[in-house]
Swiss-Prot record:
PROSITE patterns: RIBOSOMAL_S2_1, RIBOSOMAL_S2_2. One of its GO terms (molecular function) is structural constituent of ribosome. It comes from Moorella thermoacetica (strain ATCC 39073 / JCM 9320). Transmembrane segments: none annotated. GO terms for cellular component: cytosolic small ribosomal subunit. Keywords: Ribonucleoprotein, Ribosomal protein. PANTHER family: 30S RIBOSOMAL PROTEIN S2 PROKARYOTIC AND ORGANELLAR, SMALL RIBOSOMAL SUBUNIT PROTEIN US2M. It holds the Pfam family Ribosomal_S2. This is Small ribosomal subunit protein uS2. Disulfide bonds: none annotated. The gene is rpsB. HAMAP family: Ribosomal_uS2_B. The lineage of its organism: Bacteria, Bacillati, Bacillota, Clostridia, Moorellales. GO terms for biological process: translation. Belongs to the universal ribosomal protein uS2 family.
Length: 238
């Protein structure tokens, strides 16, 4: 069964690229035509590229690999959080903090501080402190939760990144490339596909398009997880 259909892609508006004056010539192989000043993405290429990305994520997940979902633009925030949580993976959906990957130990210390504040509140320590100090600590906890909540349980570097709009998330892309972490991304007509290992040519601005493509990557994770405990079938010798 096909992972995704042309009909689904069309209905979600995945084929709409950016205005022709805002394009990266490297995306030319993925462009079907131009209509009313907007590039139309070749969905036949998109279907194939989704399958490649899906298979990569599924196999990675089957081997116990972890994926970090990244999308901080408004159109992506909700989908990234919901789909990452649905498949039990990590996410960054508010702001990418520089060094999230390349300075991971420092980020881990901030996460430990977040967990410490959570413990203090759960254990009733806040009840023993002056109101002003409690307000300050709660503010600190909320800020840390906002930026780091999606990677709170990420004990080590991820095995792959799934990125919505690599142009906007260029710091995440740069960190992933520097560390040799494979990158899967929704790449619109204004992005550089050369920086991405698994390019999914598509509209990165429409909420429905982003949700559809993100959900497919989450499906790949889940399929991989379901295959983890199943031993491979032994070859039958005649």
């Amino acid at each position: 069964m096909a992972i995704i259909s042309m009909k689904q892609l069309l209905e979600a508006g995945v084929h709409f690229g950016h205005q022709t004056r805002r394009w990266n010539p490297k995306m030319a192989p993925y462009i079907f035509t131009e209509r009313n000043g907007i590039y139309i993405i070749d969905l036949q290429r998109t279907v194939k590229k989704i399958e490649e990305a899906y298979n990569f994520i599924r196999d990675l997940s089957r081997d116990g690999g972890k994926v970090l979902f990244v999308g901080t633009k408004k159109q992506a925030q909700e989908s990234v959080k919901e789909e990452a949580e649905r498949c039990g993976m990590f996410y960054v959906n508010v702001r990418w903090l520089g060094g999230t990957l390349t300075n991971f130990q420092t980020i881990r210390r901030r996460i430990e501080r977040l967990k410490e504040l959570e413990r203090m509140e759960e254990e009733g320590t806040f009840d023993l402190l002056p109101k002003k100090e409690v307000a300050h600590l709660r503010g600190e906890r909320e800020k840390l939760e906002r930026f780091l909540g999606g990677i709170k349980e990420m004990k080590s570097l991820p095995d792959a990144l799934f990125i919505i709009d690599p142009r906007k998330e260029r710091i995440a892309v740069a960190e992933g490339r520097r560390l040799g972490i494979p990158i899967v991304a929704i790449v619109d007509t204004n992005c550089d596909p050369d920086e991405i290992d698994y390019v999914i040519p598509g509209n990165d601005d429409a909420i429905r398009a982003v949700r559809l493509l993100t959900s497919k990557m989450a499906d790949a994770v889940i399929e991989g997880q379901q295959g983890q405990d199943q031993p491979e079938e032994e070859a039958v010798v005649e």
